[in-house]
Regions:
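Catalytic strand-loop segment that frames the active site of acyl-thioester-processing enzymes
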Residues: 1-57, 141
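HotDog/MaoC-like acyl-thioester-processing domains
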Residues: 1-14, 91-141
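A generic structural signal for short beta-strands and their flanking turns/coil linkers
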Residues: 12-14, 18, 26, 36, ...
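Hydrophobic beta-strand-centered segment that forms part of the acyl-chain substrate-binding groove
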Residues: 50-54, 64-104
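Short, intrinsically disordered, mixed-charge
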Residues: 32-36, 71-75, 126
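A solvent-exposed, acidic/Ser-Thr-rich amphipathic alpha-helical stretch
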Residues: 60-61
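Amphipathic, positively biased hydrophobic alpha-helical segments used for protein targeting
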Residues: 24, 42-46, 64, 70, ...
Length: 141
């Protein structure tokens, strides 16, 4: 694959982030969209009996926040742009309703021959607790 000149608009260490307070509306809305109706997310009584002691957000919601940040990074590339195509994420701690999380990406590696940017990805809560961590991949078109 030929190297795209648009790769030059990305530099190692480039970063972006997105913060959001997770609400009941977010958890119910996400459940309705993706069909994740598991009790630990939607049923307070059920959740009280779990190791978490209260309701938690779906893990994939944290991946969605990372996708928002990937959109910020993709927007840096001039037309025809860039797209995210891979998320390797591990969930480290629960996100509770009312938590304010920050999804952050830092450009860690550029694979020029594949027109790919690889980002270190993290999601932390308001106390600095790491709730999700991994890598995300952006293809420059």
């Amino acid at each position: 694959m030929a190297r795209r000149a648009h790769m030059d608009c990305y530099a190692l260490g480039d970063s972006s982030q997105f913060s959001k307070t997770v609400s009941e509306y977010d958890v119910y809305g996400f459940a309705g969209i993706v069909g994740d109706m598991y009790g630990v997310h939607l049923d307070e009584e059920y959740a009280k009996g779990t190791q978490f002691g209260k309701r938690i957000a779906q893990g994939a919601l944290s991946v969605g926040f990372l996708a928002t940040v990937m959109g910020h990074m993709a927007a840096k590339a001039p037309s025809p742009g860039a797209v995210s195509y891979r998320y390797d994420v591990t969930f480290k701690a629960p996100v509770f309703l009312g938590d304010t999380v920050t999804a952050r990406l830092v450009l860690a590696e550029k694979e020029e021959d594949r027109n790919t940017c690889i980002f270190d990805a993290s999601v932390t809560n308001q106390d600095g607790v790491l709730v999700a961590q991994g890598k995300t991949y952006l293809k420059v078109l």
